[in-house]
Design a protein with these regions (language model features):
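N-terminal lobe/hinge region of extracytoplasmic solute-binding protein
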Residues: 42-110, 297
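A structural "hinge/loop" feature
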Residues: 45-64, 75-76, 132-135, 163, ...
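A bilobed periplasmic-binding-protein/Venus flytrap-type ligand-binding module shared by bacterial periplasmic
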Residues: 74, 316-319, 346, 356, ...
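Gly/Pro-rich hinge or "lid" segments in bacterial periplasmic/extracellular proteins
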Residues: 75-78, 200-248, 252-341, 346-350, ...
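Aromatic- and charge-enriched surface segment that lines or borders ligand/interaction sites
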Residues: 90-194, 250, 351-354, 419-421, ...
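Detector for C-terminal structural segments
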Residues: 258, 312, 396-404, 428-467, ...
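Structural transition elements
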Residues: 302-303, 415-416, 448-493, 514-523
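Extracellular/periplasmic solute-recognition and catalytic clefts
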Residues: 305-316, 343-412, 436, 440-442, ...
Length: 745
């Protein structure tokens, strides 16, 4: 063998351990990340909007609510949930007025109240984050107003990349801009229908915005491609908010509504600086791809530093955040972490692996791993496996204030409407859709069947449903009615054995946006098997997501599956309003959350009564009546309430599950020393492949050297023959161009 080749082999053998030591690192984070005050977590759903006026998904709120701030918040540890001031000096107290302007004392009846005022007083230490929108010249104009794209920084990826940033205090006018903006019909704010029924002047405000847009050449439904028209929300008349001075303003309702305080803890009420709207309307900023939809401006503990929804979203500590103390960690100021990293993980298993390696600080448990990670203790409660406990992991379980339901379009002539026959059909389907079985198969038992729309833990939750699963006193739980009862209801509905009067089989259609999803395919097969029990054929009508949303808004669908609602606030009204006719999605032109378009005069009357009442026995009685009407009419198969199972590592401090607030990141602390130790322990490189490679290379080099030093027999053959002998001895094969091409192929 050529001595040079032997030398190379020995060099590789000598350098292999060093190379492995330097390069063998499976961490997804940069060097030093484990020792930094960074909270690492993940998300799996697409982030569509971080605009406070339109964002309404849980995973978006987990990001947005740590950047922008609402006037109120929930106490992090208190249960039942308790409101606390956030931007305000105190929780506002309502003042009730009669039609003649007389101040009403105590708690007047709703019918005597014509006006409600809440006085909100801002703290004096509130400032927005550093942002280019606040950079002003001596005249008060944006210094970027006359900037063209060529003058902007190259490779612009964030507002934080602009050369000049500035800030300012919060003003009451910012809250007016925020609320008036909710009235803009172009935004289709998801809570507009509910808010406008109470906040004075919202409907008039919406009409004035629409009128201004039309006067300026706006055609409804057709936004200009490049620069949408910017309405000056500051100048639009709005009677629902009155600015008093630099620190006070009034929120004004047209009727009594005790639950209005819960609104003030939602990001829809976060202040909106006019400068931000102006900035994101500039042509070069639009051309750069920056928008309020992706880059919110707030006063919260964090600001958005990196926005790459397909890879990573990163928040950094807001240097302008006020000094805020917390009783849970006396003497320490919030937030406790410098950064929050949200990493996009499409699949659950890679996320689970990284959590077990210590690279994520929290994680759910994939369905495939639930049996390995958990077990049931002697009390029948879910607990961590012994191995997970020994690794110092902690388990947090709770039934979430959420409902997922199977919905019927009440505008559809076959499954909807108020006729007795169609109601029997909906009840029959509700009986055969055994959601305990669904939970066991698809959720690994993590959830409870819903008996109505209100989840456990919120007053008014139903224990049973007399029309579908009545209470069994002997068993102490609700029991689903037998299949024979469902078949009897099908007979009453005019579909004996699923056959219509014309002799054709009853076929229903499920509209969805889950084409290609393997989980949905399995769930749809489950649905087909259940519908077949009563002779109904069900077919799917898949749509692209935006098309499916259009179908919901126009009522062009028949059945929907796994539509969900998570509580905005801990009150039964927040679930019952999903069936108030005024919130019908079609009737409200997409603004209402009554997706099934249910309408009942009897239910509406009860709802209007209970929504304005304080929480007392009389109100509870009305809630029970309203729930029974919904159970009887069955606009939905009530589905299930999911359980949330979260694992955390021992180094994560102060973690407490909170189902009402998403602004809780500031409370989380990291024991960076322990995290780094555990990551090093759990991710030691495997040494045996290195040793095996070293041994193999050493043996190869040894025998090669031995063969090199052995004298060859004397021969009179020419050097060409000797070369041929050596070539055959070591099987040296010249590599031709053709060989390389074939290998590459």
């Amino acid at each position: 063998m050529n001595k040079t080749l032997i030398f190379v082999i020995l060099a590789i053998a000598a350098g292999l351990p060093l190379a492995v030591t330097l390069c063998c690192n499976n961490s997804p984070w940069p060097d030093g990340a484990a020792s930094s005050k960074t909270f690492f977590t993940s998300f799996s759903s697409a982030v569509k909007s971080l605009d406070p006026a339109t964002s309404y998904y849980v995973h978006e709120s987990a990001i947005l609510d740590n950047i922008v701030e609402a006037p109120l918040d929930y106490d992090y540890l208190e249960r039942p949930y308790k409101l606390i001031p956030r931007l305000l000096t105190e929780i506002p107290v309502p003042q009730y007025y009669a039609a003649d302007g007389t101040l009403l004392a105590d708690d007047p009846p709703p019918e005597s109240v014509q006006r409600v005022e809440y006085l909100l007083t801002l703290r004096e230490d509130l400032r927005y984050q550093q942002h280019p929108c606040f950079a002003r010249d001596v005249r008060g104009h944006s210094i970027y107003a006359d900037t063209n794209s060529m003058q902007l920084p190259k490779n612009l990826s964030s507002p934080q990349d602009f050369p000049v940033l500035d800030s300012r205090p919060l003003h009451p006018m910012d809250f007016k801009v925020a609320l008036v903006r909710l009235c803009d019909p172009r935004l289709a704010c998801p809570v507009y229908a509910n808010l406008s029924s109470f906040i004075d002047g919202m409907e008039e405000c919406s009409r004035k915005i629409q009128q201004e847009l039309e006067e300026r050449g706006f055609e409804s439904g057709h936004l200009p491609q490049r620069q949408p028209l910017l309405v000056d929300y500051r100048t639009i008349p709005f009677s629902g908010l009155e600015v008093i001075n630099n620190h006070q303003f009034k929120l004004i309702l047209s009727r009594k509504y005790p639950q209005a305080l819960y609104w003030l803890a939602m990001h829809f009420f976060a202040p909106m600086p006019w400068e931000a709207l102006e900035f994101y309307h500039l042509a070069p900023v639009i051309d750069s791809g920056l928008s309020l939809k992706n880059w919110p401006v707030g006063s919260g503990p964090y600001l958005l530093q990196e926005m790459n929804p397909a890879v990573q979203i990163r928040l950094c500590r807001n240097s302008n955040f006020r000094k805020e103390l917390w009783d849970g960690a006396p003497g320490q100021t919030l937030p406790f972490t410098e950064q929050i990293v949200f990493q996009y993980e499409r699949e659950a298993i890679p996320n689970w692996i990284k959590f077990n390696q210590g690279y994520y600080d929290t994680s759910g448990i994939p369905s495939d791993m639930l049996d390995a990670a958990t077990s049931f203790n002697s009390s029948g409660e879910l607990a961590l496996s012994q191995e997970m406990q020994e690794r110092g992991m902690l388990l947090h379980c709770s039934v979430t204030p959420t409902v997922f339901y199977f919905g019927f379009n009440m505008l559809d002539p076959v499954v909807g409407g108020s006729s007795e026959q169609n109601r029997f059909l909906r009840q029959a389907i509700s009986i055969v859709l055994d959601y305990q079985e669904f939970i066991d198969i698809f959720l690994n038992g993590q959830g409870v069947p819903a008996q109505g729309v209100i989840p456990p833990g919120i007053s008014g939750a139903c224990k049973a449903n007399e029309f579908i699963s009545p209470w069994d006193e002997q068993l102490g739980k609700p029991v689903r009615l037998p299949l024979q009862k469902a078949r009897e209801l099908m007979q009453k509905a005019g579909y004996p054995n699923g056959i219509a009067q014309d002799g054709s089989p009853l076929t229903l259609y499920l509209d969805h946006a889950n084409a290609g999803a393997s989980v949905f395919k399995a769930q749809f097969q489950w649905l087909k098997s259940k519908f077949a029990l009563i002779g109904i054929q069900i077919e799917e009508r898949p749509s692209e997501l935006n098309r499916w949303r259009d179908k919901l808004q126009t009522g062009n669908w028949q059945l929907i599956f796994n539509k969900g609602w998570l509580a905005d606030y801990p009150d039964p009204e927040n679930f019952l309003f999903l069936f108030y006719s005024g919130n019908g999605t079609v009737q409200s032109k997409g603004r209402g959350a009554n997706y099934v378009n249910y309408s009942s005069a009897e239910f509406d009357q009860l709802f209007r009564q209970l929504e304005t009442m304080p929480d007392n026995i009389n109100r509870q009685s009305l809630i029970e009546q309203a729930c029974r009407i919904l159970q009887k009419d069955a606009p939905c198969c009530w589905g299930y309430h999911p359980a949330k199972v979260i694992l955390t590592h021992k180094w994560l401090n102060h973690y407490t599950p909170h189902d009402m607030s998403y602004s809780t990141m500031k409370y989380l602390g990291i024991n960076t020393v322990l995290r780094e130790q555990k990551q090093n322990l759990w991710n030691r490189p495997s040494r045996w492949p290195i040793c095996a490679a070293l041994i193999a290379l050493s043996f190869f080099a040894f025998f090669a050297l031995r063969g090199q030093n052995k004298p060859l027999p004397v021969s009179n053959k020419s050097n060409d023959v000797r070369h041929d002998l050596l070539s055959r001895t070591f099987s040296v094969k010249p590599v031709t161009d053709n060989t390389m091409e074939n290998t590459a192929q």
